[in-house]
Every structure is written in structure tokens, then in C-alpha cells.
Amino acid sequence: MANNFDYVGDFCEGFAVVKKDYKYGYINTKGEQAIECKFDDAMGFNEGFAVVLKDGKCGYINTKGEQAIECKFDGAGYFNEGFAAVKKDGKWGYINTKGEQAIECKFDDAKYFYEGFAAVKKDYKWGYINTKGEQAIKCKFDYAMDFKEGLARVEKDAESYTINTSGNFIVLDEDKNEFIEISKEFDGACNFKEGFAGVKKDRKWGYINTKGEQVIECKFDRASYFYNGFARVVKGYKWGYINTKGEQIVECKFDGACDFEEGFASVRKDAESYTINTSGNFIVVDEGKNKIEI
């Protein structure tokens, strides 16, 4: 069978794309030519339709090989959940299986519908619309993946997050091993540890409690988990420490910092390593291996 064609693709819904003399068509699972090789390009079938290219324009055929939707689009994707993304005049929108324009072509990019939502791109940012074309989740992410079981992965400022269909962040409470929803009013959120989670707003980090209340203002350039009652934070490229009240217990003045263990932490400054206590004082060890505060 393959010897009769220049190319044979994978089977999708009982048909495989084949190429003969620079034209594309389809065979069935018996190897029979089901749809003539007459298209300039062709994609696999999905939900009973396949994208085909004719004279530089995309349209759709059905499994009988009939031209179900005219070749008039500049770009086109598979049908999924009854909608297909199509491109006209440099913008993407969606049509239904009747070929009707269901959602206006106004997006810079558009993905398939999954679980009633599709990721769309506008002004270099990704968000989500529903099947009515309503903006369900604002375009504010650098990248967005499809929803699966009500959750989707998104990226913003080189950080990866999980959101639900309301656009709220879903994070793990590591102490209780349960998931908690955090308001989409924040730009990002981390997992809970010791009752606090780092949240991002306007490129600054702060903390909320498990009730979702802002307990420490978003004013740090970076913020780590709380560990043994203290969190490492960054201001102006320098590391320091805060307590659970948000008080700056150790000034942000170090080039690097580790978590406190039994009241002591390793820090780095000017390529030198030191040990400090929770007051920020340096600790040295004498010949008798006694720790002395300086």
C-alpha cells in the first residue's frame, strides 16, 4: 500500500492522509483510496472533519470527501468540542461545524477548545475564552496550556502556576497535603508552608495565610517558603530574613542565604561564607568548638 504513495500518514478516525504526485488525499483502513489526491495539503480527521488546503486557502471536508466548509481561511485547526480555530486577515477566531463564524477573528493566536475553554493570545499575552466567546480568564500570561480535569498550567515572568476555570491559582498546603484556591487578583502564588504562601503582585512578593488574607505586604523582589518560622527574602539583589509577622529580623545585605536550622543559618557575602543567628549576628567557633556570637 505505502509503495503506491509518496507519503502515508497515521490513521485518524478511519482515514490516513496520503500524498501522490504532490497532491494529498485519503485512504481507508483497507488501503482503498477513499478521497482523491487533489488537495495541496491535508490534515487528519477529527470530529468528522479534516482541514484541506487549496490554492493557498484552508477549508474542511467531511469523511465522504465533500467540501463541507469552503476553502477561504488563511489558517485552520482541527475541530474539537464542535469548534475550530480559523485565521482571517492575520487574526484568529472560531467557526462551528456548519462553517458559521461563532467567535470573531480578533486574537493573535488561538488553541483548541478543551472542557469548554480555549487558550487565546492577545497583545503577546495568553488567557482563556468560553464557547460563547466571552473572556473567561484575562490575557495576562506568557503561556497557557489546555484545561484538563478543571485545571491548566500557565506561565508568567518565567514562573509556572496551576489555575482553575475561574482563573484562581491552585496551590498545595505542604503541611496538610491539600489544595487551596488563591485569588486571581494576584499575579502568581506559591505553595503553602507553615501556614503561609508567597504571592506576587505588580512584580513584588508578599505572603497570605490559609484564609487568603494578605498578612505580609508585597514588597520583596523574591520570597522563599517559611521554614522554622523564618523566610528568606530579597530586596535590591540582597538576601535577608523576615519572621511570620513580616518583621525584618535580618537586614537584606547578603549575596546568598540558606534557611535557619536550630537557630543558625549560612549566608554569603563578597564571596565569603558566614554563620549567623536569628538576630543576624555572626557566629564563630573557638578552639574548643564553642559557638561565639559577634
PLM feature spans:
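Residue-level detector of conserved, function-critical positions
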Residues: 1-294
